[in-house]
Amino acid sequence: MCYISELFLNLQTNFDTMGYQLAIIGGGPAGYTAAEAAGKAGLSVVLFEKKNLGGVCLNEGCIPTKTLLYSAKVYDYAKHASKYAVTVPEASFDLGKIVARKQKVVRKLVLGIKAKLIANGVNIVTGEAAVIDKNTVKCGEETYECDNLLLCAGSDTFIPPIPGVEEVDYWTHRDALDNKEVPASLAIVGGGVIGMEFASFFCSLGVKVTVVEMMDEI
């Protein structure tokens, strides 16, 4: 963070101000971290985000999955409480309430990021931004001039080219995060971090889970 702040301070000396000294497209970990550091360094900053601050990691990735996993872990402990010499009446769960808790945790963290950006003078613009040229960004009907432009557009879901996949009602990770009904069984394509977190979560809820991974190891 100190290195980033020093970098922005050095850039500041070369500015011929044209509205904002720095425009950032994308409010994920890269974008909001850079915006906060630039704001602390005294630059005028505008940050564009078409969805929610925090990007995939906070809204649709590791933070919400770990929140779901924590609920599943507590449920597991309750089911097997006798192993720890603790008596618990019949354990149960409400997936709708688990999802609601996840959303509450995510919302709190998003608001925390927003508060830090505002505290450092960053102008947050919600909407899909388009680059007109190296010094111009358009969002909605408004045009923003900038001396420097930082692109932190993030990632999107990849649907593997499996024959017939377009004919079935499949989930992406986004659907799985907001699902409020427990399936009888689930096949997960991809044994990476997010895939295995979902596998662990649904397995804890009693779902029969199969993980398909093309590599030799998960």
Task: Please provide the spans of the model-predicted regions.
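N-terminal Rossmann-like FAD-binding beta1-loop-alpha1 element of flavoenzymes
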Residues: 21-46, 198-203
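Beta1/beta-strand and adjacent pyrophosphate-binding region of the FAD-binding site
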Residues: 18-28, 184-189
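Glycine-rich flavin
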Residues: 19-20, 36-43, 48-184, 215-218
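Rossmann-like NAD(P)H-binding beta-loop-alpha module
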Residues: 181-214
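Extreme N-terminal leader/targeting segments of oxidoreductases
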Residues: 2-22, 40-43
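Short glycine-rich, flexible loops that bind phosphorylated cofactors or substrates
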Residues: 32, 158-159, 195
